[in-house]
Amino acid sequence: MDSYFKAAVSGLDKLLDDFEQNPDKQDYLPDAYAFNQCSVSSESASPQLALLSKDQRCISTCASSEACCEDANETFLEGKIHEGLTSRPNEKNVAGLDLLSSVDASTSDEIQPSCMRRCSKPVCDLISDMGNLVHATNSEEDIKQLLPDDPKSSADTLITLDSSSVSEALTVSSVDCGSNAVREEQNNINAGIKNRDISIKELGVKVDMALFDSCKYNRTENLKDKIISNELETVDFDMPSVLMEQSSEMSNTKDNPQYKRLPCELLKDDGCLAEEKVAVAVNNTECLEEGGGSNTIAMPCKLPENEGISPSDPASKDENFKLPDFPLQENRTSVFMKQTVKEDSRNLDLKDNNDIVHVSGDDVPPSLSCLSLSGSLCGSLIHNNEHSDILPPNESEGQNNDAVTIHEEIQKSDVLDGETDLSKKETCRSIFLQPVNEKKGEGKVEVEEMVISGESLESPEDASSAAAAGSPVALSAASVPEAPGPCEGLTFPSSDMDGQELDYFNIDESMRSGILISDAELDAFLKEQCLSNSNTMSAGENVNDSQLQMNQITMKGLHDENAGDIYFNAEAGAAGENGGVGNCETSDKENTENNGLSIGEKGAIPTERELSACQPDIRDELPVPSIKTQAVGGARPKQLLSLPPGTRSSKELNKPDVVDVPESEPCTANATAVSTCSADHIPDSQVSFNSNYIDIESNFEDGSSFVTANKDSLPENKRKESLVLGQKQPTWVPDSEAPNCMNCQVKFTFTKRRHHCRACGKVFCGVCCNRKCKLQYLEKEARVCVICYETINKAQAFERMMSPGGSCLKSNHSNECATDQPLQETQTSSTPSPTTLPISALKQPNVEGPCSKEQKRVWFADGILPNGEVADTTKLSSGSKRCSDDFSPVLPDVPTMINKVDRTHSPTVEKPNNGLGDIIRSEISQSPTCHTAPVERLPGNTGTEGLPMPGPFTLEDDVFVDSEEPSTPTVVPANSGLPVASISDYRLLCSVAKCVCNNISLLPDDDIGLPPLLATSGEDGSVPVVQERPSHEQIILLLEGEGFPPATFVLNANLLVNVKLVLYSSEKYWYFSTNGLHGLGQAEIIVLLQCLPNEDTVPKDIFRLFITIYKDALKGKYIENLDNLTFTESFLNSKDHGGFLFITPTFQNLDGLPVPRSPFLCGILIQKLEIPWAKVFPMRLMLRLGAEYKAYPAPLTSVRGRKPLFGEIGHTIMNLLVDLRNYQYTLHNIDQLLIHMEMGKSCIKIPRKKYSDVMKVIHSSNEHVISIGASFSTEADSHLVCVQSDGVYQTQANSATGQPRKVTGASFVVFNGALKTSSGFLAKSSIVEDGLMVQITPETMEGLRLALREQKDFRIQCGKVDAVDLREYVDICWVDSEERKNKGVISSVDGMSVEGFPSEKIKLETDFETEEKTVKCTEVFYFLKDQDISILSSSYQFAKEIAVACSAALCPHLRTLKSNRMNKIGLRVSIDTDMVEFQAGCEGQLLPQHYLNDLDSALIPVIHGGTSNSSLPLEIELAFFILENLSE
C-alpha cells in the first residue's frame, strides 16, 4: 500500500516541477474538474473521488487513511495561528491509477466512506488539506517567504515536496461575543511586520500530520510554546465604517513579489491572472472558562468539521484577480464537518476537510481558489448552501449557506465516531466581505474596497465564539485610474449592516428568533440575466434523509474584460447591474437540508438576502432538465453534476426571520436592476427551479459586462424590453409541449385548462393568464399573461411619465423582453400592480381560441370544450358577467408579493410558520428564459387597519403546510400589538381566543362579578389586554371619562360586548352592542337601557340576555326584525319586565352611538302585558311605543319600570284574525307588502316576487275573508297607531316629520266578502284600529281572488251605488318593488354593497370543525339579474352544496386564517352558459392564491354538477365565519 502512495507522491513532485518549469504550457491543457474532497458520505465517496484528478484523489485518499490510522496521537499547538501560509494544489490533470480503489479493493468502497470503512482516522492528510486553502499568487519567491521561520513548526505544519514548497494560507478570525468585535488574527510568517502583543489562551489543537517522505501516516508532534507573529485586527460594529485592513504591507503592495508566481497561478493567453485568496472558517468547538473567552486554532493540515466556509477576496488592493477569457466552470462546495468536542480535554479534533473545488475550462485548466468566491465572481458574493453528502442528517441542520457568513453550531449529536458530548451552541453572524468598488482596466479587475460587517451571537453559557473570516481586508482606496463604466460601485460603511446577517444558513429553532434580516435585502441581491448558448450544468444531487446534498457552484464563461463593478448595499437592499446586452438570470431559492446553486453559461450569482425571508412552499417533485456536460481529461463527473431527466424531491424547512428596513432608507442608484433577454438564444430545454436547485442558463455576448445599472439606464432598458411584447405575433407553443403551466407549474387537467398568452405565445393556466391588453399586431384587446401585462403596463406608464405629451412609446421591434421592476419598499408603495392580487382560479370568457368549431353551450375560457374540441369563442358571449378584475381592491389587506419575472411568474406570499415567524416564500419557475426582478411587496393597510397580514401561499393545491403558531416581525401575535381599527370590527375576536378559556359563558355565577374586560385604547397599534374580574368602580371610571372608548367585555371567545354610558335624547343611557353574533348568522344587537339615578353598577342581566341569544343562534334560532325574546323570571330587578322586542332601525337617530356593522337590531324592553302583542302583532306594539315616546316609528330606548301600553285583551278585531290566547295562528304577513292611504284612495302594493306568499294566504283563508299583514312603509310620512284606553282600541296617527300627512301607512288589510248587494253599497272601506277594512260583495271577492291568482291589478270602488261623486277607490297593484334588505351590508369578497339583493340563512346539516375551531356558513346572497325573478329552491340547494365544499376546503387552514385576522370570508360564485368563476376574500380583500387553488379543486366538481340543475345565469355569495369551539 505504501508503494502506491509513494508513487503518487513521486508523480505529484514531477507534476509540480513541470508546472514550475513550464508555466506557460498550460494554455493548451484540456478541461478538468478539480475536486478536493474527503468523503464521509455513504454514497458520494467513490463518485466524487472519481471526479478528482489523480493527484487530488491521492490527496483525498491520504487524508482518509490518516484519519483512520491515527487514534491517539495528537498535536497541540499553543499560541497563535500561522496565517499567510499558502499552499497550492497541482492544477494539472493526471490520468492514471485510481489510488483510492487500489488501496482498498473492497466492493463496499462505493457506498462506505473511506474513514468509516477503515477506522476513525484518515489514511493520509499530507495533501488533502492542501486543496482547501489555495492562495493564488504570481511570485515563486513567495513560497519560500511564506514558510514559517521556526523550522520545527514548519516541518510539522507544512509538507515539503522537494523544492516545491506547498504551504497553506489559514485565516482564523475570532469573534468577541461580548463586544461584538471581530478580532481577526492573521499570521504573516515571512515579513517583518510589527506584531501586536495579544495573549491568547493556550488551545490544544489536534493536528494530524503525515511524514511525507516515508508516507507513515501516524506521525504527530506536539508544538508547544511557539510564538508566531501575527496580526490582530478588531472590527467595531458601532463605528460608522468598518474597513478591515491588513497591516501586512507585503501583501498589500505591488512592490512585494510575494504573490507573483505560485504553482496554482493561472497564466492565460493575455497574461492575465486569476488570483484568489482563501479564508477558512474554523469552528469554535471548545469553551474555555479562563479569560472569558478563547480562540480556536487550526493547523493547515486539517480543517475542522465546520458548517460553513468564510471566503474572502485577495488581501491586496493591487492583487489582480480576473476571470479567464475562456468559459469557466467553477463548482465548489466547501463543507466543514462538525466535530466532536470533548470539553474536558479542550482539544479541537479537526476532522477531514470536505472542500470540493470544481474547475473546468474549455481551453485551459484554471487555477481556482477553493474559497475566494467573491473575487472570482467579480465581487458578487455567492450564496452557497453548504450541505455535505458526507454528513449524517443531524450534522447538517445548521450549515452556513453564505460564502462569507460563518455560522457555527455545536450541538449534541452523533458524529462519525459515535461521540455525543457536544454541548455548546454558538453563532457568529455576518462576517460579511464584499467588494464594493472594482476597477476595470487592461483586462484586470482590481478590488478597491471591501466592507465587512459582523455580529456575534452566543449562548450565555458559552465562553467564546471563534469564527474565521478569510483575510478580511479593506484595501486602501488608492487613486487608481478608473475605467469608464456605466456606474461606479459605492462604498457602504458596515454600520449600515449592523445587526444583519446573511440568511443562507440554517439555524436551530432556539436561535432563529434572534436572526433578523432587512426587509429590503431580498431585493438587494445582484440580479443578472443572460441567455445560454451552451449546456447548463445542474449542480448537486438529491439524497434521502440519511444523506445530505453536496452543493456546487457551476460557473461558465465569465470574460475577465467584462468582469466589472458589481456591488451590493446590504442595508438598502439594492443591487445594480448593467442591463446592456449582457444578460444574467438568477433565481433565488432556499432550503435548509437540500440546496444547490448552479450557474450555467457565464452566469454570476450575487449575494442574496431575503427581505421577506421567503421559504419555498412548492411541489415535492419538479422536472429536471436533461443537460449533459462533457469533461475532458483527468477526473470525470460520472454524471454527478449532469443528472438525467427525472424528478427531485424538495423539503420544506424553516428559514430565519426577517425585519423590514426603515421607511426612510434611501434608495441609491443601485436600487434597481435591469436585465435584458434575447429571445434569439432561447434553448429548447427548460430550466427547472425548486427549493434545492437554481439552474440558470446565461450567456454573455461580445461586449457584455457585469456593471451596475444607473438611474438613467433603467428606463431605457425597461422600454426596450417591454416594447417587443405585442408588436408581432409570437411563436405559438403547442399544447402538446406544455403539460404544465409555464409559470406556476400547475398540471393541466380537465378543469384546469390551457391558455395561450397572445403576447409571448406561451401556455399558462387561467390564473397566470387572466389579463387583457391591447396588442399592436392584433389591434385589439387579447388575453395576455400577468407577466406580459405587467411589462406592457409598466413601460407605457413610464413613457407617459417621461413623455410631455403623454403618448405611448413606440420603437422598432426588438427581441428583448423583460419585466424587471424598480424596487418598491413596503412602506412607500401605494398603488398595487394589476398582478398583485390573486384572481379567481377559474377561467375567463371572451378569449379568442386558436381555432374554431361549432358552438357549444358550455365551453372553457381558452376555447376548449369538455369533449376536448375547440370552440369558436368569437360567437359566444359572456352575458352580464363581471370580470374578476372589477372586484380587485386598491389596497389589499392580505398582500401578496409578486416577483415579476419575464415569462415566468413567481408569486410569493409571506406566511408565518411554526411559531418562529418564518416567512415562507415560494418560487417555481420553468421556462427557457428566466429573469429575476426585485420583489415588490404591497401595503396591506386599509383605513386604520394597520398591518399587512400575510397569508399563506403556494402554487399547488396539494402542497401547503399550515403554520400553527404564527409570530413574525410583520405579523402581530394574536394577543399583542394587534391594531384595533374599531370596536365593531369582527376581526377583533382574533385577539381574544388565546386570552380566555373556551367556555360558552364567562359570566361569573355571582350577582356582582363582571366578565373579563378587553382593554384597548382603540388606536392603531394598541395592544388589547384581557383583565379578569374587573370591578364596577373601575368600569364606571372608565365609562365616565371623556374621550375613552367603550369598555369591551368578553362573554366568550366568539362574543364581545361593548358598553358605554351615553347621553341620548338628553337622558343618560347604558349603551350595549355585541360583536360576534354575525359569526352564527345572527344580526348584532344593540340595547339603549335607561340608566337609573345613582346607578354605579353595570346591569349584568343584559350580558345574560346576550348569552341567551348566542345559545339560541347556535341552535339555529335566530332573532330578526320584529321578533321578540321573553323572560319567565325577574329581569333587571323587576318581575314586570317581560322581554325584548327587536326592531331594525329606520328613521331613528343613531348619531353618537358606536353602532356595530350591519345588519344589527335594536332591543326594546317590553312589559309582561305587552308580550301577546309582541308575539302575534309586533308591528302594533312597535308603533304604539313610538307614539308613546314621540319617536317615529319606534324608540330605540328601553325604559325601566314604565306602565304597559296595552292591558288585558279587549274587544279588538285581532280577536278574529289571531289567537291571542294560545298563539296557534296569527295574521299572515307578507314582507314588503305596503298599504298607503291617501285622500279618496287607498293602495295595496304587492311585490310581484311575493306571488307565492299571496297564494299561501288565499289558500289558507276562508271563503269570505282575506286578511294580510303589511310591512312598515318607509315611503309613508305617517302611520296608523292603535291605542288602548280603558279597554277600548282607538286609532291615532304618528307622523315622522310633524308636517301635514299626505301618505299614511296601515298595518294590515282585511277583505270581507259578506257585504250584501241590498245594502246599497258597492263596497265599504274604513280604518279599523291601525289597519284597513274593505267590505266587498261575494262577487267582488271572487273577482279579487281571480285577480290575485292571475297576478293582475284589481280596483274596488267604494261608496253608495248612486253617489258617483263621493266614491273612493281601493287599488290592488302588483309592483316591481325594490329590495330593501341588507341595508349597509357589504361583501367580504370585494367590499361591494349587497344592499337590495335578497338573501337567506343557510343551515347545513353538519358543521366542519377541527379540535379548536369551526367554519360556519351563515348566509347566501343572490345577485339576481332581474329583480323580479324569484329564487328557486334549486338555487338554494346549489348554494348549500357550494357551502359544504368550501367549508371542507377551508377546514384544514382555519387556525392559520384566524391567526392572520381572516375570520370572516366571502365566496362568490358566478355561473353562466359560457363561463364559471369564483372569488374568495376577507374584509374586501381577495384571499391568497393558495386558498383559491384549494377551493378550485373542491368547488369545480360541484359547480359543474350544479350547472345543469340551476337556472342560469346565477351569481351567489356565501358568508363563512371561523369560530372557536366552546363548551357549556
From Swiss-Prot:
Compartment(s) where it occurs, according to its Swiss-Prot or TrEMBL record: Cytoplasm; Early endosome membrane
Keyword tags: Cytoplasm, Endosome, Membrane, Metal-binding, Phosphoprotein, Zinc, Zinc-finger
Residue numbers bearing the Phosphoserine modification: 120, 803, 833, 884, 927
Binding site for Zn(2+) 1: 741, 744, 765, 768
UniProt cross-references to InterPro entries, sorted A to Z: SARA-like_C, SARA/endofin, Znf_FYVE, Znf_FYVE-rel, Znf_FYVE_PHD, Znf_RING/FYVE/PHD
Binding sites annotated in the UniProt record for Zn(2+) 2: 757, 760, 785, 788
Membrane topology recorded in Swiss-Prot or TrEMBL: Peripheral membrane protein
Basic and acidic residues bias (residue ranges): 649-658
Keyword Magnesium carried by entry: no
Low complexity bias locations: 821-838
Zn finger residue spans: FYVE-type: 735-793
Region (Disordered) residue spans: 629-664, 819-849, 928-949
Function: May be involved in regulating membrane trafficking in the endosomal pathway. Overexpression induces endosome aggregation. Required to target TOM1 to endosomes.
Subunit structure, as described in the record: Interacts (via C-terminus) with TOM1 (via C-terminus); interaction is required to target TOM1 to endosomes. Does not interact with TOM1L1 or TOM1L2.
Domain remark from Swiss-Prot or TrEMBL: The FYVE-type zinc finger is necessary and sufficient for its localization into early endosomes and mediates the association with PI3P.
Protein name: Zinc finger FYVE domain-containing protein 16
This protein's encoding gene: Zfyve16
